[in-house]
Regions:
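Positively charged n-region of N-terminal signal peptides that target proteins for export
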Residues: 25-28
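Bacterial N-terminal signal peptides
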Residues: 30-39
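Sec/Tat signal peptide C-region and signal peptidase I cleavage site
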Residues: 40-44
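Short, glycine-/small- and polar/acidic-enriched structural segments
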Residues: 45-182, 186-192, 196-202, 214-219, ...
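A bilobed periplasmic-binding-protein/Venus flytrap-type ligand-binding module shared by bacterial periplasmic
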Residues: 64-65, 128-137, 227-242, 290
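Pocket-lining segment of extracytoplasmic ligand-binding domains
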Residues: 104-105, 177, 182-273
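Secondary-structure end/capping motifs
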Residues: 239-317
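Conserved C-terminal helix/tail region of periplasmic/extracytoplasmic solute-binding proteins
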Residues: 310-340
């Protein structure tokens, strides 16, 4: 048996052994101190679920806000779920999602006395363009022609009707609408001469030009018609106003980024929309300036949206703006961001 060596207290070897014994204890104590801090930091991010209907540029605000860290700055972590407006409304009311982003669906639901309200708007004008066969040089030349839309009664028909009204044409008498399904099917009908023109959101204008068609009008240059933003349940407005304010602020920051950072936004659109750079660039150039910088909901556009929704639902009673929108939290968010 090897004899144990004894080292006097205070010797170098004894001090090293004490140090080696103390170090693990220090590390353990440090971990016990820092882990709750890290845990609380992670827990500080509230998880929210946001519904959207389709992968198009006008719904880019909050996904870009997530990617660029604007939601994180507000202590939020979002999950984005693609769903149509019918499912979106149902899951909003049950609390399975927190927000939905198609404002037309929110207005229609509120008019139908579903307890939801718009709290912010990020794209205040319609992004659709009127695209025609090359022989047509103006909107007025479409008098008496067949215009393709996706479905009857949808937003695209509403936008089309208002485009023709803007140019002095009666959409019920001067043109005929034909429901032709998806954009590519309508482009095919245009190529065959079955319809004279159609409407579509980006990148419809880019694709149409590549096929030899011409853009006759951009709806957002003609009138306000709130397209995307945030609406939520009345219950959440009452119970979680601070969370709503943080969502609104993140969206405003994202919109400012979109308007001020062309290259960065094009890259984000490529990734989120799964399109190539050429198409993303054309999409940005078509709609980039359509995003607002303050989250405001234009009153004239909201009134138009209400009237069109009333017609579709055959509702005759007067609808106050306060029935479909609550902008008190938006004003607080704007104030905190220095927006007058």
């Amino acid at each position: 048996m090897r004899p144990q060596r004894c080292h006097p207290v205070g010797s170098k070897f004894s001090d090293r052994r004490k140090s080696a014994t103390r170090c693990p204890m220090k590390k353990i104590l440090w971990c016990l101190f820092i882990l709750p801090i890290l845990h609380s930091s992670v827990q500080a991010e509230d998880r929210i679920r946001i519904g959207f209907p389709e992968l198009i540029a006008s719904y880019s605000t909050l996904p870009l806000g997530q990617k660029r860290g604007f939601l994180k700055e507000e202590g939020l972590q979002a999950e984005f779920i693609r769903m149509n407006s019918t499912v979106g409304l149902a899951t909003l009311i049950t609390g399975d999602i927190d927000y939905y982003t198609t404002l037309g669906a929110g207005v229609a639901a509120a008019i139908g006395r579903v307890p939801v309200k718009i709290v912010a708007c990020y794209v205040p004008g319609p992004t659709a363009t009127l695209i025609a066969r090359p022989e047509f040089k103006s909107v007025l030349e479409l008098r008496g022609k067949i215009i393709g839309i996706n479905v009857f009664g949808g937003n695209l028909e509403i936008i089309a009707r208002n485009v023709f009204k803007h140019y002095g044409l009666d959409p019920d008498k001067d043109v005929k609408f034909l429901a032709g399904g998806p954009l590519q099917a309508r482009f095919s009908s245009m190529t065959q001469g079955l319809i004279a023109a159609t409407l579509g959101g980006p990148p419809a204008d880019f694709l149409g030009k590549k096929m030899g068609f011409v853009v006759l009008a951009r709806a957002h240059e003609l009138f306000s018609f709130p397209v995307t933003g945030v609406f939520t349940s009345v219950k959440k407005i009452k119970e979680r106003p601070d969370e709503i304010k943080r969502v609104i602020k993140a969206g405003i920051k994202a919109n400012r980024y979109i308007r001020q950072n062309r290259d960065g936004t094009i890259q984000e659109m490529m990734e989120w929309l799964k399109i190539d750079k050429e198409m993303a660039t054309a999409t940005y150039d078509s709609v980039g300036k359509g995003f607002n910088e303050d989250g405001s909901l234009p009153e004239d556009g909201l009134r138009l949206l209400i009237e069109e929704s009333k017609k579709a639902a055959k509702v005759s009673r007067e609808i106050a703006l306060s029935e479909v929108a609550d902008l008190s939290i938006l004003r607080e968010a704007q104030k905190e961001l220095g927006i007058k």
